[in-house]
Amino acid sequence: MPDSMMDMEHRDHQLHRQQQQSHHHQPPRLTASTSTFAPPAPAGSQSEERDRDRDRERDHHLHHHQSNNVASSPLPVTASIQLHQQQPQQQQQQQPLTQLQQPQLREREHHQQQQQQQQQMMQQPQQQQQMQQPQQQLPHSHHALMQQSQQQQAIHRAEARRADEEISDKASTCGKLLIFLSVALVIMTLPFSLFVCFKVVQEYERAVIFRLGRLMQGGAKGPGIFFILPCIDSYARVDLRTRTYDVPPQEVLTKDSVTVSVDAVVYYRVSNATVSIANVENAHHSTRLLAQTTLRNTMGTRHLHEILSERMTISGTMQVQLDEATDAWGIKVERVEIKDVRLPVQLQRAMAAEAEAAREARAKVIAAEGEQKASRALREASEVIGDSPAALQLRYLQTLNTISAEKNSTIVFPLPIDLITYFLKTNEATTQQNARAAAAAIGNTPPPLQLAPQQQMGQQQQPQYQQPQQQQQQYQPQQQQQQQQQQPQQQDQLYQQGQQISSAM
């Protein structure tokens, strides 16, 4: 509908321009009733005729557009009749309107429609929010109150600044007067005023100057000579060297409910002399108190084993916290170190007992591992000695050398191994002979009386017992001969070993 209205306005404007051009360029027309030349109509009548023609054309377009809409939409017959009845009434109302009033009315109507649409669009999301989030009204109201309070605070601050500026303007005149008087006083007492006006600051110091209670522009002065005016200037010396502070022992309850006493040392220095004087009353005292509280807070969030094993980490966290807190005071914390952690006596005893038990268990494990390794070594040595008798002889000689090296009054001289082996061999031979003799005696006993078949069996078995006896008789002279041959060799070996031992001693 707004597009059709715009088209109609455009067409009306074009028709109006065409009519103006036709009135300017066309000659006067003759009427149909008479053949005489009609006089030109006045300007007011012409404008009224143009307005009527334009209104008729507009009404015609409106009627045509409404008829199209009625044909396209399924309206009832009564609605179409009402529309036809309303059209002449609208035409009668619009005819007396002038050419300047019609566009104004249209613009007003269009503007009102736009405002109504915007209001509807703005009300829809608000209604949705109220339906969906009814519980968020209190936070919004609280937020609005906070904003109002912030605005009021900003207004008060602005008013205070204005008052300060007014006071400063008034004081500036007095300050200028006092400065002029002090300069005049210096000039009048020139030889003596030099001792009062010139000051010296060391390399590690800075001077913060106040003139009439305000900081001088340019920051702190120094090192070297600086100038002050008497009676109106004052200054404060600030030492920039690093200072140490021993934090006294602090009783702290750890996270696992153990009471410990912890002390530390803090290294800090003044990084900004002006800020350290202007922002805090006593920067050094404030830093020391803050170090104590930071030590308590940091230790209270740790377990006992963390305090004992992670001292470097705790020191680093304390250094960062102190540095951030003292930055507004012009203080730079360079380092923090934990000195000592004192535990209660009962806890020390319990920890000592636990450590001792752990050490004993560790020692037992080590001893068991050593015995296991020693048994393995002895087993390997016995296997080697059993495989080669010469290794046993060498071991015997080594023991003799170690015994002879000791400075003792009594020397134990053990028997030679060869002699021991000889006795062992003879003992084995005698045992074997006794066993064989017993077997032979058993074989020579007569069998008991039995039946004929058993006697036959006894006769068959008799030669079996006689065979070992014959073998023993043959073996005994051979063994005796071997022993007789080995005796001189063994005696020679024993004699040589005795000489070696005597020479070693």
Curated annotation (Swiss-Prot):
Q: Where in the cell is it found?
A: Membrane
Q: What membrane topology is given? A: Single-pass membrane protein
- Main localization, broad class: membrane
Q: Does the keyword Transmembrane helix apply?
A: yes
Per its UniProt record, what InterPro entries does this chain match? Band-7_stomatin-like, Band_7, Band_7/SPFH_dom_sf, Band_7/stomatin-like_CS, Stomatin_HflK_fam
Q: Indicate whether Cytoplasm appears among the record's keywords.
A: no
Any Gene Ontology CC annotation: plasma membrane
Chain intervals with Low complexity compositional bias: 82-104, 113-139, 451-505
Q: What is the superkingdom listed in this entry's lineage? A: Eukaryota
Task: Tell me the leader sequence span.
Answer: none
From the record, give the transmembrane residue ranges. Answer: 178-198
SMART domains according to UniProt:
PHB
Query: Compositional bias (Basic and acidic residues) spans?
Result: 47-60
**Family the UniProt entry places it in:** Belongs to the band 7/mec-2 family.
Q: What is this protein called?
A: Band 7 protein CG42540
